[in-house]
A protein has these predicted regions:
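Short, solvent-exposed loop/turn and secondary-structure capping segments
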Residues: 8-13, 40-42, 79-80, 103-104, ...
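C-terminal catalytic histidine-bearing segment of alpha/beta-hydrolase fold enzymes
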Residues: 113-115, 121-169
């Protein structure tokens, strides 16, 4: 999921992660908001519509979708999942953050895989522990870690991620 203004630049920034996921057998969509509005706005059904279109046009597993994003895309994936935790299989945010003013409902053991660079340009490493605690208090199952020596954008530890993905229901 591309976050921020959801423009073409953000979609391209998500592309390498998406390519890796496709190479590993996933179907992906990188949505772009034409008007720059966030997909996590209350009442916004565009993500559900995109997922429906993917199922209508491709042969996919019937399992719930996994929301994945990096940077503001990771933050947006987390915010979307927090609005409707029953609709998703989990969230991968590498990195991502949930804003402190975001209301969290019961997350019903929704799995989150969150990684933030030790030298994050936006200092998200400083909030990872409190964010993890907040998500857990809301009922999420959180696998979070600081990536040593990494900045805001970093290489994914695919062995760790695939191990986590293998445990999803």
């Amino acid at each position: 999921i591309a976050g921020g203004s959801n423009n073409e630049f953000m979609a391209k920034a998500q592309f390498w992660l998406g390519n890796e996921l496709v190479d590993r057998g996933s179907a992906i969509a990188v949505p772009i908001s034409a008007d720059g509005s966030r997909f996590s706005a209350a009442g916004d059904s565009r993500i559900e519509q995109i997922i429906g279109q993917l199922h209508a046009s491709h042969t996919l597993h019937d399992s719930k979708p996994l929301l994945v994003g990096m940077s503001s895309g990771g933050s947006e994936a987390m915010a979307i999942a927090a609005l409707n935790p029953h609709a998703y299989r989990g969230v991968v945010a590498t990195p991502g953050r949930i804003k402190t003013d975001t209301a969290l409902q019961e997350l019903n053991k929704l799995p989150f895989y969150i990684r933030v660079g030790e030298k994050d340009d936006f200092k998200w490493d400083r909030i990872l522990e409190s964010m993890t605690q907040r998500l857990r208090l809301a009922g999420a199952e959180v696998n979070s870690a600081i990536v040593q020596d990494a900045r805001h954008v970093f290489q994914i530890d695919w062995e760790s991620l695939e191990n986590w993905l293998g445990k999803l229901k």
